[in-house]
A protein has these predicted regions:
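Short, intrinsically disordered N-terminal pre-domain segments
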Residues: 1-14, 95-96
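Surface-exposed ligand/attachment interfaces on beta-rich extracellular proteins
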Residues: 11, 15, 41-45
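Amphipathic, heptad-repeat alpha-helical segments
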Residues: 21-31
């Protein structure tokens, strides 16, 4: 998953790997709190394209907030919020 996040954020070096791994873990927990089934999210290499995009968007939001621009961070946040909302209402992604 780390390689997918780095590709989405256009990062080609390893300086931020620890921070990105923490963000990936936080993204998974945030999706689980929203009701997204952890069987879908708790994988070192998820294959579901919607889950991958949501995790990348979450990481982009928080990473850009610290290391980038507020404009890019807000764009990632908007994307993540929409993805999380849709996933939390989809019956094949939720725990309820």
């Amino acid at each position: 998953m780390l390689d997918k996040v780095k590709l989405a954020l256009l990062i080609s070096f390893d300086d931020f790997d620890d921070e990105l791994n923490d963000l990936i873990g936080a993204a998974v927990l945030d999706l689980n709190i929203a009701g997204v089934d952890d069987e879908t999210t708790v994988s070192d290499d998820p294959t579901d394209k919607l889950i991958i995009r949501a995790i990348c968007s979450y990481c982009g939001y928080h990473f850009e907030l610290i290391h980038g621009t507020l404009e890019r961070s807000e764009a990632f946040k908007k994307s993540y919020d929409e993805q999380k909302s849709q996933l939390s209402m989809a019956t094949n992604y939720t725990t309820w």
